[in-house]
Amino acid sequence: AVQRQGLALVTRRELEVLRLVTAGATNREIAQELVLAETTVKTHVSSLMSKLQARDRVALVLLGQKVLLQ
């Protein structure tokens, strides 16, 4: 339920980042794919972790798998 509330706050760009994180891409690879600075990707990942209450990147990937399969 908490993740669902957080998901409502996720931006379109953060959703793109989540898709790539879930696919196993590194921050550098995500930055290249989305034409962003690596620090911007780190900011998006941190924001996603906060919004979705993921304690680490692995938890974020697991949440991403659930969210993206719906």
Residue ranges of model-derived segments:
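Intrinsically disordered, low-complexity basic tails/linkers immediately adjacent to helix-turn-helix/homeobox/MYB/SANT
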Residues: 63-70
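Hydrophobic patch in the ABC ATPase nucleotide-binding domain
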Residues: 7-10, 54, 69
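Recognition helix of helix-turn-helix DNA-binding domains
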Residues: 24-59
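Regulatory hinge/linker segments at domain boundaries
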Residues: 1-20
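Short, locally clustered residues in the helix-turn-helix/winged-helix DNA-binding domain
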Residues: 19-23, 65
